[in-house]
Amino acid sequence: MPKSLKIAHIVRRYTPAEWGGTETVVRHTVAEQRALGHDPRIFCTAALQPPDARPSDDIQFFPYFYPYFPMPTADRLKLDKKGGSPYSPALFKAVRDFRPDVIHIHAGGRLACAAVKLAGRLDVPSVMSLHGGAADVPASEMAEMLRPLKGKFPYGSVVDRLLGMRFDPIARVDAVVCISHTEEDRLKERYPGRSIHYLPNGVALPEMRADAGKADSLRNRPRPLRVLCVSRIDYQKNQLALVELLARRPDCSLTLVGPVTAQWYADKIEARVQELGTGDRFKLVPGLPPGSAELEAAFAAADVFVLPSVHEPFGIVALEAMARGIPLIAANIGGLPDFVHDGENGMLFEPADADALARAYDRLAALPAEGLARLTSAARATAESYSWPEIVSRLMRIYSECRNGA
C-alpha cells in the first residue's frame, strides 16, 4: 500500500443535528486515517443540511433528489431521515475529480450503485460498509421506511435501467464490511466467494470518563434509579418498551435522548406516558450534539443505560456507556451480543418478550455491590478492546487486500 492514500467516503447524510451511528463511524474513521497520513474526504448529499452549510477539508455537500413524483417536502424529509435512495450527479463528479485510490461506500441504493460503477471506471477498489444491516432488517421496519413512496410514480426505475444501475452493489464491490457476526454469516452464505469481513465499530476511549463510583451509587441510592437511553427516537429503537418499564417499576425514572427520526413514534411515546401517568418520572430530550456538555451530563447522571432496540446492527452507544462504567441492559439482537455478554459485562434480554426487560432490570438491581463492580469493570475492559486506532488499522488492511487484488 502507498504511504498515503486518497480515500473517498460516500455518505448519504451527515449532520450533527440528526447524528447517528454512521456519522460517528465516518467521523472517527476519517480522523484516524488523517492521523496515519492519508487523505480521506467525505462526499455527502445535502440531506438535512441548513442552506448555509459550508464545505471543509474533510467534507463536501452536494445537491440530490429522489426520483419519484410527486415528492412533497414532508415526504422528502422523511426519506432524508431514514431510507432515502437519491441521485446526486454532482457528488460523483466531485469524487471523479478527486481521483481517489479507494472508494469507501457508507450508503446503499443508488448512491452505492453509482459508487461501484465509478470505482470500475477509475480502476480503483470499492469497499462497502453495511452500517444499517442488509441481511437482517425486519420486514416491518423496511415497510415503514418505504411508506413515504406510497402512491408516487417511480420514474427513477426507468433512469436506473438507462444508467445500468439496477444491480446488487454487495455482489459487485471488492469488499463488504459487516458490523455483526450474524450478518457476516448470513452474507457469506448468500454471497459465496465474496470478500466479506467482520469489523466492529469502535469507541473513542479518550473522550470517555469512566465513573468507578456508579456501582456504589446504584446500590445506595436514596432516589429513583435513573435509566438513560441515548438513540434516535424511532420505532427501530423500541423506546416504548422503556415507557412500559417505567410504569411497572416505580423505583426508576427515564430519560430518552436522541433526534426524532419518526415523529409519529415520538408522539406515541408522549401519549403513552400521559396515559400511564408517569410524566413526573419521564423526560424526552430530542437530540444533543455528540460530545456536548449536555450529553455528557446526561451520561454522568445515569445509573443504568438501556438499549432496547428491535433491530441494532451494532450499537456504538452501548459501548460508550460501557466505557463510562454505566451498568448496561441491552437487547439480545444484531451486533449487541457480539460484545455484551449476559451477566458478565451487562445484561441481555429478548426484545420480543414483553416481560424480559423488567426481569433484566430486576436482575441488575438485585446485584450486590461487588457484583455490580465486577460487571462495570468487565464492561470497561470490553470497551477498551474497541479503540478506533485498532479498528481503523484493520480497515486499512482490508483496503490493502483489495488494492493488491485489484
Feature map (PLM): residue ranges:
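A conserved mid-protein helix/loop that constitutes part of the nucleotide-sugar donor-binding site
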Residues: 24, 225, 229-248, 267
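Short hydrophobic beta-strand element within catalytic cores of glycosyltransferases
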Residues: 327-330, 340
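Conserved acidic donor-binding segment of nucleotide-sugar-dependent glycosyltransferases
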Residues: 342-343, 347-354, 363-369
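Carbohydrate-associated surface elements
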Residues: 182, 202
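Membrane-proximal helix-turn-helix segments that form the acceptor-binding/catalytic region
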Residues: 121, 134, 152-175
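Nucleotide-activated donor-binding/catalytic signature segment of Leloir-type glycosyltransferases, i.e.
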Residues: 267-289
